[in-house]
């Protein structure tokens, strides 16, 4: 972790810890080294919207790179999570002193911004079934949600997160998952759903009607 690690501060957050709150003064940028950080906006009591889950190699809190910015979401560690934090001052020093090595970090931030713009497009243009398939496709790239044979595994405790990522009620998600089972895309075992990622990619391709498929923000390798 040489280059960026020389400038940032490493921290380990326990599961459920709130790293920052929406509306708080923002500074710098965080990089996830291990674990997951859920970015969530509260809509009402017991409900929220999750635009993205930051995983290993991804950034969050980059609002802090703008002058006078405030955080746009809450950020919570969903499990024990290790992050690297660069304050605005440390980030500027990194850019000034290691200009060539800042390109991967800036590319990562831009990739994640593009993903959020695509997420807005989904909310405006796709129905619940389509948004669910896109979300499942995104989750299938995270080994936390997959079985050893590569299938996506959704358990009962994942349903709230799905609701918040898709932007739909629990009832709508349950119906959409049932339709995936009927279509042969998902297999149900009790309260658990098993899905082959390739079937999601094929179905998502059908929904895009010839347009470019929805991209997943790529992960930056820190060396």
Task: Label each region the model flagged.
Residues 78, 96-167:
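Polybasic "coupling" helices that flank or enter modular domains
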């Amino acid at each position: 972790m040489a280059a960026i690690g020389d400038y940032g501060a490493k921290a380990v957050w326990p599961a459920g810890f709130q790293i920052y709150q929406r509306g708080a003064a923002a500074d710098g940028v965080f990089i996830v080294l291990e674990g997951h950080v859920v970015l969530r906006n509260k809509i009402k009591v017991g409900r929220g919207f999750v635009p993205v889950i930051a995983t290993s190699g991804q950034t969050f809190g980059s609002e802090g790179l703008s002058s006078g910015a405030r955080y746009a979401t809450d950020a919570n560690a969903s499990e024990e999570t290790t992050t690297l934090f660069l304050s605005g001052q440390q980030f500027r020093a990194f850019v000034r002193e290691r200009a060539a090595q800042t390109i991967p970090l800036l590319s990562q931030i831009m990739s994640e911004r593009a993903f959020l713009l695509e997420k807005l497009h989904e909310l405006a243009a796709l129905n619940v079934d389509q948004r669910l398939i896109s979300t499942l496709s995104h989750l299938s790239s995270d080994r936390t949600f997959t079985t050893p044979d590569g299938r996506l595994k959704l358990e009962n405790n994942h349903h709230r997160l799905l609701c918040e990522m898709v932007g739909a009620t629990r009832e709508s998600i349950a119906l959409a998952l049932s339709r995936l089972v009927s279509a042969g895309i998902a297999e149900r075992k009790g309260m658990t759903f098993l899905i082959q990622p390739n079937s999601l990619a094929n179905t998502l391709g059908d929904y895009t009607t010839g347009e470019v498929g929805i991209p997943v923000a790529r992960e930056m390798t820190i060396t």
